[in-house]
Curated annotation (Swiss-Prot):
One of its GO terms (biological process) is regulation of cell shape. It is found in: Cell membrane. UDP-N-acetyl-alpha-D-glucosamine binds at residues 195, 287. This is UDP-N-acetylglucosamine--N-acetylmuramyl-(pentapeptide) pyrophosphoryl-undecaprenol N-acetylglucosamine transferase. GO terms for cellular component: plasma membrane. Its main location: membrane. The keyword Transmembrane helix does not apply. Pathway: Cell wall biogenesis; peptidoglycan biosynthesis. It comes from Streptococcus pneumoniae (strain ATCC BAA-255 / R6). It is a peripheral membrane protein. Pfam families: Glyco_tran_28_C, Glyco_transf_28. It catalyses: Mur2Ac(oyl-L-Ala-gamma-D-Glu-L-Lys-D-Ala-D-Ala)-di-trans,octa-cis-undecaprenyl diphosphate + UDP-N-acetyl-alpha-D-glucosamine = beta-D-GlcNAc-(1->4)-Mur2Ac(oyl-L-Ala-gamma-D-Glu-L-Lys-D-Ala-D-Ala)-di-trans,octa-cis-undecaprenyl diphosphate + UDP + H(+).
Length: 352
């Protein structure tokens, strides 16, 4: 039986594509393994998926771009993770390794290369993360969502592979219940801040609940169960799975962080959106770059977190609603998306 090893983690964005691809390989008779951190979100997501995947936990160290005494300790953690990954590779003898990035992916990528296993990696953002910059040196090929510099000879630009589609599905009963609390004469705004929510969005909704619910139906994916609430013109919930796409479809506008997975999902369904990217003080600036790219393409509006107020947000919402047809036309004309089926076929061809 053919074997494939997946790796990637730290955030949902480093796991999502793997979760989409693994069932395809299982259906085709592959034995699927995953290398990650048992304390990480990658392990949680695989357990929730119920997929027939063997999980191997390794030591991990965070890759920091700044000086910290913890870097010294993490060098040893990464080194031990490489040794653990090498033993896994030598024991399994897989046909390939597919990495979605995140610091946990570096040891398996290095170990795969050392043991002669072809390495395929995927980069979602406009600029490579530190983990993928390291992984690229050991990779057979990198697939990218955005076009990369021509000097990167091992990169193939494939566009975004998303988990949502423009196909309409029957409304879940829970969605029908939510809609009974909404005023259908008001626009619906969805706040989504990634796998852990976004405190800045949560605070905005909390501080201005009265004003917001007078003018909009508000959906707030919080990442915090203590904020759960269903009341007139307001639905706050910590986490959703099956409701994710239905809520996106229900919304007239989405207010989101600038993670590539989410914004390309919005592009796939031509949904109006305002991007509030993580700042450079909290990230490497990749979300700022992603947001600027989407604004330049005419897909979205952006708003820096430092400028986020009720007034500034409402100005963006009003602009999007007033120019809805223009934004949606540009999104529908986009050639930057790839279906999961097409990407899977491309990957299988490269593996053969």
């Amino acid at each position: 039986m053919k074997k494939i090893v997946f790796t990637g983690g730290g955030t949902v964005g480093h796991v999502t594509l793997n979760l989409l691809l693994m069932p395809k390989f299982i259906e085709d008779g592959w034995e699927v393994h995953y290398i990650g951190d048992k304390r990480g979100i990658e392990h949680q997501e695989i357990l929730k998926s119920g997929l027939d995947v063997t999980f191997h936990s390794i030591a991990t160290g965070k890759l920091r771009r700044y000086f910290s005494w913890q870097n010294m300790l993490d060098v040893f953690k990464v080194g031990w993770g490489i040794v653990q990954s090498l033993f896994i590779m030598l024991r399994l003898r897989p046909q390939t390794l597919f990495s979605k990035g995140g610091f946990v992916s570096v040891p398996p990528v290095i170990a795969a290369r050392v043991s002669g296993v072809p390495v395929f990696i995927h980069e979602s953002d406009l600029s490579m993360g530190l983990a993928n910059k390291i992984a690229y040196k050991f990779a057979t090929k990198m697939y990218s969502t955005f076009e990369q510099a021509s000097s990167l000879s091992k990169v193939e630009h494939v566009g975004a592979v998303t988990k949502v589609s423009d196909q309409k599905n029957p409304e879940p009963d829970e969605l029908v219940d939510i809609q009974t609390h909404f005023n259908h004469k008001l626009p619906t705004v969805l706040f989504v801040g990634g796998s852990a929510g976004a405190r800045v969005f949560n605070q905005l909704v909390t501080d201005h609940k009265k004003e917001l619910t007078e003018r909009y139906n508000i959906i707030n994916l919080t990442g915090d169960s203590s904020l759960n609430e269903l009341s007139q013109n307001l639905f706050r919930v910590d986490y959703v799975t099956d409701l994710y796409q239905p809520l996106m479809e229900l919304a007239d506008i989405v207010v989101t962080r600038g993670g590539a997975n989410t914004i390309f999902e919005l592009l796939a369904i031509a949904k109006l959106h305002v991007i509030v990217p993580l700042g450079r003080e909290a990230s490497r600036g990749d979300q700022i770059e992603n947001a600027a790219y989407f604004v330049k393409k005419g897909y979205a509006e952006d708003l820096q977190e430092s400028d986020l107020t009720l007034d500034s947000l409402e100005e963006k919402l009003s602009h999007l609603l007033s120019h809805k047809e223009d934004y949606q036309a540009k999104m529908k004309a986009s050639k930057e998306l790839k279906s999961l089926a097409d990407f899977y076929q491309l990957l299988k061809k490269d593996l053969s």
